[in-house]
Amino acid sequence: MTVMATDSSNVTTAKEDSQCAADNDEQIHPTASDHLDHLQSVDEFKSLMYSMQSARRKIVMAILGDKEIENDWIEELRRTYAKITDSNTKAFQREMSTLSSKLSINIKDEAMGLLKDMLFLERLKATKSENEDVRWPPLLAKVDLASILAAYHPISEKKFFEEYEECLNFLRSFAESNSNGRKPIFITDWDGTMKDYCSQYATNLQPIYSAVGMTRFASRFTRLSAVLTAGPLRGPGILDLTAMPIDGPVLFSGSWGREWWLGGRRVVHEDGISDEGFDALERLNDEMGNLLHSGDYSQFALVGSGVQRKVDRLTLGVQTVYGHVLPELSHRYQDAVRERMHRVDPQNHILVFDPSTELEVEVVAHNSGNVWNKADGVDRVVSTVGDSLETPGRVLVCGDTFSDLPMVRQAATRNPEGVMALFVGLNEKLRQSVRQLITDQSRRCFISCPDVVHAAMAELLNEKLNSTQ
């Protein structure tokens, strides 16, 4: 069963560039006395980051729409970077206050994303100042994104460029695979694939350079582009965290493809979930909202997964990857969750408490026994838009974990000669599983981090632009 609902919310080296960005930061950093003895609260941190992300979206829309970029928007990025790297942050560990205690979280992803964006924008604005009457696409072609991102590769700059060349050739073969004038399909996971992992799901925010490149790539080279993520659409979810236009050429899903944002509406696939299960999850979600505004538990809004309301479950972060939460507090929080489950489901026949990992637990609604995975999500969106994975045409699936393999398997079943796969990360067992599904090595690609594919996408767009001039 499918239901529709309106949305309820809405060539300078990299090192030289880094010094330039740092010089700008020195001009806007507050003095030590400005933040002495003041710890940012969890809510203040989230508010700061969401306000900054709004500025990112404005910049992305300006670039895509060939409009002016306001200096105030760039200044907001700089102010945010200065704030989150002030004296309360040491080695990317930021100390914050909760209602009754202190919390230390890792903000490396948030800080690095902002730094790379500032380097990207500096080059873009410098190019614009020398070519004031030129539109953004030709100016973007003058920005060597690979030279900015290479310094942040997890292994080495040399490895970055090796993977970059391989990925660029791979994407060329995908983009040039038009069959009878029919562009290919692009389907991707999000976290760890198109976006670096972040210690806090609630502030796992997409940078500008990534949003601009992905949107242009989807529009220029594909007939269907879709993001499938395990997280929700809202609350926060992918629609809150992305910097891409949510009603643009890239479609967004949450809950493994159970919920989609299509035509300005949330489309939900309820297969196997009872009405009482939905109702119980909704009431528990309300209970969790109240719990997070009480005493020690407020910090759990920013611990790992936070509180994610998915179609068939709640996913709750109970510990950070660095073990910053006291075990006793984590256990008390989980007990408080169970107590609220009992309020909602006193007979214990609707909701199931699943301590899935050391970092998060899940509260799952009983279902009819059907096991939903991302392959089901792919099928639903492809059929909804009246398309097919079948030949003719290529289908590129991108992922970074074993949970993404069902998408590859589905595409390989429907289109064995046209399926392609790009996987991110260093897990050799996962890579071997991909090789078994796609035996033609020209139709698979392995890279170490998302920035490699963003640099390759940007360069491919530049090549196509230059070839038409």
Question: Which stretches of residues belong to each language-model region?
Answer:
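Non-catalytic pre-domain segments flanking phosphatase-related domains
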Residues: 2-190, 198-202
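Acidic, Mg2+-coordinating phosphoryl-transfer loop and its flanking beta/alpha structural elements
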Residues: 229, 396-456
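Short, surface-exposed amphipathic charged segments that create phosphate/polyanion-binding patches used
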Residues: 263-274, 369, 460-468
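Conserved acidic, metal-coordinating active-site core of Asp-based
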Residues: 301-303, 308-396, 402-412, 417
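Short, glycine-anchored, charge-dense loop/turn motifs used at functional sites
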Residues: 189-195, 263-267
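A short acidic (Asp/Glu
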Residues: 198, 236-241, 318-319, 405-411, ...
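Phosphate/oxyanion-binding active-site loops and adjacent basic polyanion-contact surfaces
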Residues: 203-207, 277-284, 369-378, 402-404, ...
